[in-house]
Amino acid sequence: MASFTNKFDSIKQDWNTPKLLFNKLNQEFNFIFDLAASKENALCPKFYTKDNDGLKQSWDGSCWLNPPYGDKSSKMVDWIKKAYNDTQANLNLTVVMLIPARTNTKWFHDLCMKAAEIRFILGRPKFGDSKHGLPQPLVLVIFKKSDETKFTSFNLN
């Protein structure tokens, strides 16, 4: 019998957002909040850290979110739920999330498919000092008040 290792599992939960990816999106969205950052890796003028827990805060304006994720982190779904619920209640809120493209999961179909836009990332963005991109596909989920979901691809080049 073949052995199986889960290449999508990660002990590390605090990967820095790839700068090229963020900069390209920031030109479009002009982010003011980084919703899940550290003091060392925050990408926006305003940000929440583990200490002031973005899940417990009010969100407004244009927000970037690279939530902690991995098979050991059930909190990622909490971030997605909050992004969806808050954008439905606040017309001034846009949340752009970078998450794994786990299209086979219930949470992806129940929550992400209600987003205003889903952009499938072409290629494998590199996080931190890694030589290679993640071994899993990533997606940008854009939550804002909308009646339909738009699907596109996002090219880093």
What annotation goes with each model-predicted range?
Residues 1-157:
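Class I S-adenosyl-L-methionine-dependent methyltransferase catalytic core
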